[in-house]
Amino acid sequence: MQLKNLDTGVALPLPDDLLWSDEHAWSPAVANASYLITGSLLIQSATRKSGRPITLVGAPDMAWVTRAAVEQLRAWAAIPVGGSTGRFELTFTDGRVFTVAFRHQEVAIEAEPVLGIPARSGNDFYRLTLRF
């Protein structure tokens, strides 16, 4: 799996064992129901064109990344979505590719040291959660 910054072309490899936790908790169909003044039910529905959430979660004993990778991800997550910035290409090992942006309305990145103590080196490992 890899995440590529579409503005700079820089790619960051991610562990293949990150789990897409909300992969099947989303539907492209969206609807709104309301009652008219006459008492009739009005249902408006459409198909979403974008905005599918992707949450990647690492299990406690796998999908670790280095502190250096966490720092790169945090720097990328700090980029606001603009004309050509803040968009990334997420490529899964099975070939699926998504254009994503970090979810700034939520905590975009959670990283916890594997050893439970503050990491000192760029090579120390972290458990990771990413929200796009």
Which stretches of residues belong to each language-model region?
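Extracellular/virion structural assembly segments
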Residues: 1-132
